[in-house]
Amino acid sequence: MVVANDDVSSAKRSESNNTGVSQISKQEIREKFKSFYTREWGQTQPCRETSLHKFGVCSNVLRNEGNAPFMLSRGPVEGGVSKVAVLFHGLSDSPFFMREIADILFDEGYTVIVPLLPGHGKRDATSDMSDWDLAERWQAHVAEVIALADEMGDELIVGGFSTGGALAVEHYLNSANNIDGLMLFSGALALSENAEGMSRIWGIKLLARIIDGTYQTHGPNPYKYPNVAGLAGLELMDIINAIREKIDEGSQIQVPLFVAHSKDDATTPISGVEHLLAHSNASNTFFVVDESYELCHADLVVNDKLLNAMNFNESMLTQQEDCAIPKSNPLFSTMAFMLRAFVN
């Protein structure tokens, strides 16, 4: 394990932008959050799983409640200061995979929002995963969730896993004013050489759409699609290219940045986040899991608790790849310690 820590500091909004807690009530926040998904799915319903601090939005269109978007909140913070965090999940994933990171931030006093990106967590996602405007739908949802989060307090940190991290960075580079810190877990700022090469082939999106056909959502993991749709992967590449263009034009990251990544990540090579860090002017924390741990891309945010709750069905595997069976990150507790230091 290698940990590079560059003057870790909390992600605080400048005093000039500190307007205190918005007057929006907890009920208004929940209704607005729910309205995003009523519009997207057509109908929502209360989740059966309830807890004192958790508010989820469920629907019959979802595979199960573990795929549902949720919020963690305690209510107004004494002294009129509220901290809000937004965590976006990865491509083919669901909010389930953000649970443990969300709990860490909640324990540190944050209200945490974990949205569900369009096209994810559903029983039937064929029309979504063949949508030419899927990336634009992701971006629009990211924007509306962050706008809601900005109403809720005077400190806002945003990030996510893989594609979720890329979407957070892309939004920051286009609308930086209300974001005070970024968090990337296996951030998808580069893809494998093969994937990036394929994305440059003329007409590849049409071909991918044809090959994808009827998209399979049911598989061994109840909270993750069994495969990434080809067209959706190319939509992600568009997001990555947009980030690179912004950086090439001279854009810089001006807020504290937390980055956690495995050197053995073959899905999103670590070079992508290293390039971003090279264009940052803030205090950063870079947590690197050494190659000797052989930690796969998706396993970075998995601890023993999440793995046990996953109920992964190995008997349904159709292929035996090195990273096909989820494992817990042996350095998760150390990563969590570094994240806590970052936000304090």
Sequence positions of predicted segments:
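Acidic catalytic loop of the alpha/beta-hydrolase fold
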Residues: 263-268, 294
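Short alpha-helix in the alpha/beta-hydrolase fold that links the catalytic acid
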Residues: 100-101, 268-282, 288-291
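Gly/Ala-rich beta-loop-alpha elbow adjacent to hydrolase catalytic centers
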Residues: 159-168
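Active-site nucleophile loop of the alpha/beta-hydrolase fold
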Residues: 183-194
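Short beta-strand/loop motif that positions the catalytic acidic residue
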Residues: 253, 259-261, 265
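Catalytic active-site module of serine/aspartate enzymes centered on a nucleophile-bearing elbow/loop
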Residues: 296-344
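Catalytic nucleophile-loop/oxyanion-hole region of alpha/beta-hydrolase
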Residues: 123-152
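Short, surface-exposed "cap/lid" segments of acyl-processing enzymes
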Residues: 65-120
